[in-house]
UniProtKB/Swiss-Prot annotation:
The keyword Transcription does not apply. Gene3D superfamilies: 3.30.160.20, 3.30.70.1660, 6.10.140.1950. PANTHER family: LD18447P. The gene is prfA. The lineage of its organism: Bacteria, Bacillati, Bacillota, Bacilli, Lactobacillales. It comes from Streptococcus pneumoniae serotype 4 (strain ATCC BAA-334 / TIGR4). It is found in: Cytoplasm. Belongs to the prokaryotic/mitochondrial release factor family. This is Peptide chain release factor 1.
Length: 359
């Protein structure tokens, strides 16, 4: 099936979905209505571009016809030739755009995410940088109109984070932040450095798609749930009722502790969200490691410990090592203006996938 046949199939299905979504039987079935609405939305950009492309093809035919019928009118012929030139250029642009729109979509792209940031090598400075990354993602999420909720946080004594877990919810969150997983390196002079020497520290970021219960079912027998008293600063118990929850997935020994909420039920719900995402991610990682040819056709090696980006404060420079992108805009990027980096990563990924398809 060539690209035009594929596009026609997508348009036919889109029109069918429009009819189904106005069917009273479908409207009354909430689950089916939501599934079909999601499918329609995922095809909308492709169909709009395809219809515009067909109009451009018609413009080419019309311009060629006008040239034939110009009847020696030099001005009319010149106008028609310019229109033909413009339409042919548009045709090439649309063909590239449509190839990208037809690339297989990551099924997780529309999902919310669980974001984990940890201070790694570098002690207090690494923990402080983890806090800087948290602020960067919070501000980026705010600019995108997403909801950002810190679910779990473990701070150190200087205001940094040993570990912080957040839920980011909104439109196409995973599609934009999935490239952030990996080791982020910072080069700067710590506040405590009296000699003015630049230190290098690292924080790690992990982005996992949110996994609904219906998508990934964990056998309750595989979980151990412990209930205990939440503790505050200094380790003292802050609740008379045991509200903190620890859940361990026994087959993998993946553990989540949650005590941020006031009730045991809410802590348990949040802990289950995180453990479901971590367990699903654990097994997805194993499956992907077995297909490393596919993994290496995307950005980087996919290794979670891979150094993906360096933030150099003295030079106000950010370098993404996977795509060779260097920007002298560190202050802007850390303030949440990540679009230039994200767009470059998305474009690189699309280009790599197109090259794979053309082989």
């Amino acid at each position: 099936m060539n690209i035009y046949d594929q596009l026609q199939v997508v348009e036919d299905r889109y029109e069918e979905l429009g009819e189904l979504l106005s069917d009273p039987d479908v409207v009354s079935d909430t689950k089916r209505f939501m599934e079909l609405s999601k499918e329609e939305a995922s095809n909308r950009d492709t169909v709009i571009a395809y219809r515009e492309y067909k109009q451009v093809l018609q413009n080419i035919v019309d311009a060629e016809e006008m040239i034939k019928e110009s009847g020696g009118d030099a001005d009319l012929e010149e106008l028609a030739k310019q229109e033909l030139k413009d339409a042919k250029a548009e045709k090439e642009e649309y063909e590239e755009k449509l190839k990208i729109l037809l690339l297989p979509k990551d099924p997780n792209d529309d999902k919310n995410i669980i974001l984990e940031i940890r201070g790694a090598a570098g002690g207090d400075e690494a923990a402080l940088f983890a806090g800087d990354l948290l602020t960067m993602y919070q501000k980026y999420a705010e600019a995108q109109g997403w909801r950002f909720e810190v679910m779990e946080a473990s701070m150190n004594g200087v205001g940094g984070f040993k570990e912080v877990v957040a839920m980011v919810s909104g439109q196409s969150v995973y599609s934009k932040l999935k490239y952030e997983s990996g080791a982020h390196r910072v080069q700067r002079v710590p506040v405590t450095e009296s000699q003015g020497r630049v230190h290098t520290s690292t924080a790690t970021v992990l982005v996992m798609p949110e996994v609904e219960e219906v998508e990934y079912d964990i056998d309750p027998k595989d979980l151990r749930v412990d209930i205990y008293h939440a503790s505050g600063a200094g380790g003292q118990n802050v609740n008379k009722v045991a509200t903190a929850v620890r859940i361990v997935h026994l087959p993998t020994n993946i553990k989540v502790e949650m005590q941020e909420e006031r009730t045991q039920q809410k802590n348990r719900e949040k802990a289950m969200k995180i453990i479901r995402a971590r367990v699903a991610d654990h097994f997805a990682q194993i499956a992907q490691d077995e297909q490393d040819a596919e993994r290496k056709s995307t950005i980087g090696t996919g290794d979670r410990s891979e150094r993906i980006r360096t933030y150099n404060f003295p030079q106000n420079r950010v370098t993404d090592h996977r795509i060779g992108l260097t920007l002298q805009k560190l202050d802007t990027i850390l303030s949440g203006k990540l679009d230039e980096v994200v767009d470059a990563l998305v474009l690189y990924d699309q280009t790599q996938k197109l090259e794979e398809l053309n082989k």
